[in-house]
């Protein structure tokens, strides 16, 4: 989580010392990570691999990190990543290098000779996205690591409200083996309207609509499929009513003008965190996304980082 104090999240967190939240910002693929964090001390090796294709970043333009004590060497940020560089200098940013979806350490010869196990459907963008979100790279995982984590912490919450919430649809990241995820609309939609099921804005219409919907859910309960669908709908109604009762709390907006897609998502997440006591939440996981970033053969032409 980067710069959360600017999003109003710090004030939201401060309500309870026993509250923990994980906010996952998922970048939807295509970014050239090798041109984001660049080895400064071993620049020659980097340049040897990158200069022939014309995508090496000049060493003189890198935003230097200083020597990183844990590895005893220096790196550089891409010259336009000034915001991340500032956070690094303030001690608010950590970089996890050399992570990915490999099943095991793989060499070029091992890949060519098929002696290394490689991710399922390697080079498929959609499969790689799923593998990042499931943390399973050698098979089609049925659940995401966010959802599986939610399975483990749900009992800490004193509510039926889901522990995992997405502002970017229903990605597999949010799917658990036990817990069902919640997907809500983003800001500037009011939080108390982020789950409205019926489209009627005024409370009298909403209330009457729900009375009739509840009656419909009692029909055809002898059929397993209908019974299951009715249970899910009934739970959704309960969650919408719980969220509606919280109102629309005020939080500091994301500091961009005009509004950004990511800022709108983070603002709604900040609102959710701020009403956690009303919802009975102690542990929550949030998912939002940005991108994608595929440049294909235009990376050299574009010249800017992703």
Regions found by a protein language model. Give the residues of each.
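Feature for exported/extracytoplasmic and membrane-associated proteins, marking the mature portion
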Residues: 1-306
């Amino acid at each position: 989580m980067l710069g959360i104090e600017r999003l109003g999240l710090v004030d939201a967190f401060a309500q309870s010392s026993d509250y923990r939240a994980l906010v996952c910002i998922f970048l939807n693929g295509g970014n050239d990570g090798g041109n984001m964090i660049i080895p400064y001390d071993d620049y020659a090796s980097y340049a040897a691999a990158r200069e022939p294709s014309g995508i090496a970043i000049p060493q003189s333009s890198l935003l230097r990190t200083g020597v990183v004590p844990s590895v005893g060497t220096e790196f550089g940020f891409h010259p336009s990543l000034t915001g991340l560089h500032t956070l690094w200098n303030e001690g608010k940013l950590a970089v996890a290098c050399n992570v990915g979806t490999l099943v095991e350490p793989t060499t070029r010869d091992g890949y060519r000779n098929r002696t290394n196990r490689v991710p399922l459907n390697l080079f498929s963008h959609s499969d790689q996205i799923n593998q990042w979100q499931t943390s399973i790279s050698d098979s089609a995982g049925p659940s995401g690591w966010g959802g599986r984590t939610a399975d483990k912490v749900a009992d800490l919450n004193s509510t039926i409200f889901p522990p995992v919430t997405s502002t970017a649809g229903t990605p597999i990241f949010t799917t658990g083996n036990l817990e069902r995820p919640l997907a809500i609309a983003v800001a500037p939609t009011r939080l108390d309207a982020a789950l409205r099921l019926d489209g009627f804005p005024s409370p009298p219409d909403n209330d009457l609509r729900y009375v009739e919907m509840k009656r419909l859910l009692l029909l055809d309960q002898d059929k397993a499929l209908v019974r299951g669908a009715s249970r899910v709908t009934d739970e959704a109604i309960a969650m919408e009513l719980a969220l509606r009762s919280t109102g629309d709390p005020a939080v500091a907006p994301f500091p961009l003008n005009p509004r950004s897609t990511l800022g709108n998502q983070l603002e709604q997440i900040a609102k959710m965190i701020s009403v956690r006591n009303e919802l009975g939440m102690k542990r929550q996981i949030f998912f939002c996304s940005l991108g994608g970033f595929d440049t294909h053969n235009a990376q050299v032409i574009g010249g800017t980082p992703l």
